[in-house]
A protein has these predicted regions:
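Substrate/ligand-engaging "lid" and interaction regions
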Residues: 1-344
């Protein structure tokens, strides 16, 4: 399946760093109801250096707290003006984590019990899990795409057909957000835990370690890594012999899911650059692979060699330098993490 779909539901885009006044005015719109975010695993974090008067706060939870507080004041604490918040960051129970971080800002900024109560009673922050491989801008195919469209579009985004969004929320929220009626694979469930553990461990975990191993070997696309004589065996070993051994679900179910993941990795229409996966590799490894490494060590009494190799490749990548083919290695992460790893 290879198709083009025009996305026509976005009315505008705002940069809070250059348009903060307009960004804050969003909170003044009475019809505003939903906030959806994806700022990667590194995004939901508390930064005590953020101030209420910052325009804007540097962290995402800080910006969101500013927006919520402005809405609270604008509508004088009207509980019908609360917001429903769906974080999509790949953190287990991301909604709980985001909520905890907002509470930290409420305390840090002394925003008061009235606002805290309004946030607790009028707003909902729900844990979610997203599953879709989205490589981004299709540089290799953009000329053919523009020819087919008959106009220039510099915001083309490539994605696989498969998609799943699991939201841990009550049915009242599902009624307000009836995505299924739009033909979308969105599930409202009592717990996202089983979906999260399986997906993060057997899709994102392999992604995170295969990418630096492949890149340092001169392989730039996930599909090519899977089909590589050596790296392909490495990916299979990490998935089936290491990570799968750390899960408590039926083995036949896990094997089917893992084989489906490999089929998605091999998608001939999706050129998923490993460098796009390696953004913020260290926090990704911490959430996607380190739990499996620890569980494997506890159960087997030895370290999983494939996951350790992946970590070594990440550290090597963060040190920068030049690949064997002459390509410059340019890592991207928080400065404190990059400086630490360069010193190893």
């Amino acid at each position: 399946v290879n198709s083009l779909t025009m996305i026509d539901v976005i009315s505008r885009a705002l940069n809070p760093y250059t348009q903060n006044d307009e960004f804050m005015k969003l909170a003044e719109q009475p019809e505003m109801r939903f906030v959806i975010s994806n700022t990667t695993e590194a995004g939901i974090a508390f930064d005590p250096a953020c101030k209420l008067e910052d325009a804007p706060a540097s962290s995402y939870p800080g910006k969101l707290t500013q927006l919520l507080y402005h809405r609270f004041k604008t509508f004088n604490g009207d509980k019908t003006k609360g917001l429903i918040i769906f974080p999509c960051e790949l953190i287990f129970l991301n909604g709980h984590k985001l909520k905890e971080t907002i509470y930290q800002y409420i305390e840090l900024w002394n925003l008061g019990n009235e606002f805290k109560t309004w946030f607790e009673e009028a707003c909902g922050v729900y844990a979610t899990l997203v599953d879709r491989i989205v490589p981004g801008f299709p540089r290799k195919d953009i000329a053919a795409i523009k020819e087919k469209l008959q106009y220039d579009d510099n915001l083309v985004v490539q994605a696989e057909v498969f998609h799943l969004w699991v939201i841990e929320a009550p049915q009242e929220v599902a009624k307000e957000f009836p995505a299924d009626k739009a033909g979308l694979n969105v599930l409202f469930v009592p717990s996202e835990a089983p979906y999260h553990e399986r997906k993060v461990t057997l899709l994102n975990g392999p992604h995170t370690v295969l990418s630096p191993v492949a890149y340092l070997s001169g392989v730039n696309i996930v599909r090519d890594a899977c089909q590589h004589e050596v790296i392909g065996k490495y990916i299979h070993k990490v998935m089936f012999d290491e990570l799968m051994e750390t899960l408590n679900l039926p083995k036949d179910e896990l094997e089917k899911f893992a084989n489906d993941v490999l089929e998605r990795f091999n998608n001939p229409f999706v050129d998923h650059a490993v460098t796009s996966i390696m953004l913020n590799s260290f926090p990704k490894y911490e959430t996607r692979d380190l739990p499996g490494l620890k569980t494997y060590l506890e159960r087997k009494g030895e370290l999983p060699k494939g996951l350790v190799l992946g970590l070594a490749a990440i550290i090597t990548y963060y040190k920068g330098g030049v690949r064997a083919d002459g390509a410059e290695i340019v890592p991207n992460d928080a400065p404190e993490i990059m400086n630490l790893l360069k010193e190893l």
